[in-house]
Amino acid sequence: MILHAIVRGRVQGVGFRYWVLEQARAQGLKGWVRNCHDGTVEVEAEGTEDELFEFEQNLWRGPVLSRVDQVLASRHDTPRDFQGFQITR
């Protein structure tokens, strides 16, 4: 299962991508996270339904300096060939 999410709020310049990286790796998820030009952060993660539910809930928390206003999330079954979890540009 794949989770695709766009996170809105104060999520750039506050360590959000590195925090997502740590959360994803701690859960054993594969995928990526990146900053977008519009000030959002985009995430794509692969895992079980339960893992992705927990991960999505964690996205609402974010690191201490962040403020998450919205998480736009969708799920799909299209297989990916992710190699671990990484920050992309």
Predicted regions and their residues:
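Intrinsically disordered, low-complexity, mixed-charge
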Residues: 1-89
